[in-house]
């Protein structure tokens, strides 16, 4: 756009006055501009410094502290402001580091407790295995054919019961008495310990005269069962080849012979037998075993 010159009439007497007014007006406007510019710069500096301080607080949580340069050095020099030295204000230690240290200690304590528990349990199992090995060595191998804990403990129980039976069967020999002549043995003193040997027999001989002989049992029979093992006590009259026939009958009943003890007193004989009930056997209870043995003893005595 072309500039056009505009000519104003001038008062010959007011030229100096107008020039003076223009000069004062120009100085006043320049002072207002400088003041406004200074105020704007101060506000801008305060806003930038607050933004820098907020950024520093956020960065303190995740990174190390370093010296930051002054963002607006020229403006700070003009306004007489100084830069904030970050190194003069060391940051406080953050709680997250302490928490991590405490968590590491807790993990170490938990790991130590776990290792201690494992060591105690290992020692307990080792001691239990040693005791089971000693217990298994004290009894015949037929009582504990398997090496597990239940078999060893069950076999030990059966072996202790068998030893008790053997001890009771040896009592008649210890308490044997003789008549005054010394050549004969009292029959009553020998039979008495045999009768005391049976606690709860399933079959018993009838001594009363009013009971028919056919209804009485030919032997005293008592059976006890522990799991798959059975302890049998039989007291009867001695017969030839009776023991061989009894063992054969036990095998036919699927009763495996584990231990046998025989005690004789004059015309009587006491069998202490330990057997194992095999799988597939029809004898599942003490009454079944006692009934089968009663029939076997009756048949043996009738054959002889």
From Swiss-Prot:
Coiled coil: none
Compartments, as annotated in UniProt: Nucleus
This protein's UniProt keywords: DNA-binding, Nucleus, Transcription, Transcription regulation
InterPro entries reported in the protein's UniProt record: bHLH-TF_ACT-like_plant, bHLH_dom, HLH_DNA-bd_sf
Feature: compositional bias, Basic residues: 92-104
Presence of keyword DNA-binding: yes
Protein name per Swiss-Prot or TrEMBL: Transcription factor bHLH94
